[in-house]
């Protein structure tokens, strides 16, 4: 899938199939975020893959809006360095890279927060 096509067709998914996502697809999703440009190459982020069902259920109870998080095969928690002046915008760029990479892999996603 071309980047432009992914941008034009991506959807915010709120219902997930109960099938596992291959580890190599998860790796590509995280790698796309890691390779995203950041202000002064600070890379003020950490990515935490959550694929434990009990943890996903707990996570779904605290994210806004996010009950559907409990249905997902995995989630990625993004932590940023609050001292970075562009941490939020840099992390936002990385998240968008993950969303588009997942979509190009045939994997739906949704961006939530708390």
Regions of interest found by a model, annotated:
Residues 1-25:
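Specificity-determining recognition surfaces
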Residues 70, 105-107:
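Short, structured loop/turn "capping" segments at alpha-beta junctions
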Residues 100-104:
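Short hydrophobic alpha-helices that are characteristic scaffold elements of the AMP-binding
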